[in-house]
Design a protein with these regions (language model features):
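Positively charged, small/polar-rich N-terminal and surface patches that mediate targeting and assembly
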Residues: 1-109
């Protein structure tokens, strides 16, 4: 058995969970924030049998595509009197960072 842990853009998560569910996979989602822009992410946990890993990864590839967005980063910490003019930056968002880890023991109570 394997545990698939994936960090995806929060905009991709509803479609991803729907596609996983239609293929019979259960998943748990946790909202997360991080990175340079502190944009919203979702961390997906999905336990599957070894032979199902490639199918699950295919669902992620189909659901989590990369795209370019222009976003304004949060302003830096400034001293009184300093001024910061925010400039939008081009940022690649979407896609997925996926970890597949072995499960030594699984128990459903």
């Amino acid at each position: 058995m394997k545990l698939v842990i994936a960090i995806v853009n929060e905009e991709d998560s509803p479609n991803l969970l729907d596609r996983l569910g239609r293929r019979g996979y259960s998943a748990t989602i946790s909202g997360t924030r991080g990175g340079f822009l502190r944009i919203g992410n979702a961390t997906i946990f999905c336990g599957v049998e070894d032979e199902q890993v490639e199918d699950v990864l295919t669902v992620f590839r189909e659901s989590c595509t990369s795209r370019i967005q222009y976003v304004t980063p949060l302003p830096p910490v400034m001293e009184p009197g300093e001024m910061h003019i925010p400039t939008p930056v081009e940022k690649q968002v979407g896609g997925a960072t996926i970890f597949v880890v072995p499960v030594d023991h699984f128990e459903k109570i």
